Amino acid sequence: MTRKQKRLSVIVGGLAFLGAATGLTFYALGQKASYFYMPADLTTASVQPGQRIRLGGLVEKGTIQRGQGATVAFSVTDTHKSVKVTYTGILPDLFREEQGVITEGSFGPDGVFVADSVLAKHDERYMPKEVADGLKAKGVWQESKSE
């Protein structure tokens, strides 16, 4: 093998390795991706039972029900549509009615969203970006009254 052929084979091998690494990275990221939806978006989205998504909105007033142990049921709304959510675990301290939340999980076969994580807004001025953008797009955004 000449020097030129060796160099060419090293370059081709390096490019093949880089391409394989890039492909595996995108494949792994695609498997872990969870898409964000507001409750009203779910009517037009093709979300399959078991598919991981993030569901965001406001905790609907009067829907928080504490079950046995650490199980909690509540509804997430964007003021147009509501989705029933169940969660087993410790809720954030700031979780309460009419506050912004993002839940991550999947729909069960019964149509109830089974969350494995719940994130609540931090203070009266903070709202998760996805939730705020979704509420603004639906025309139901309310500015903070504490200013």
Curated annotation (Swiss-Prot):
Subcellular location: Cell inner membrane
Entry binding sites for heme: 122, 126
Record flagged with keyword Cell inner membrane: yes
GO cellular component, one term: plasma membrane
Sequence similarity: Belongs to the CcmE/CycJ family.
Metal-binding is among the record's keywords: yes
Cross-referenced SUPFAM superfamilies: Heme chaperone CcmE
InterPro entries attached to this UniProt entry: CcmE, CcmE-like_sf, NA-bd_OB-fold
GO term, biological process aspect, one: cytochrome complex assembly
Topological domain spans for side Cytoplasmic: 1-7
Disulfide links within the chain: none
Keywords assigned by UniProt, alphabetized: Cell inner membrane, Cell membrane, Cytochrome c-type biogenesis, Heme, Iron, Membrane, Metal-binding, Signal-anchor, Transmembrane, Transmembrane helix
Membrane topology: Single-pass type II membrane protein
Entry protein name: Cytochrome c-type biogenesis protein CcmE
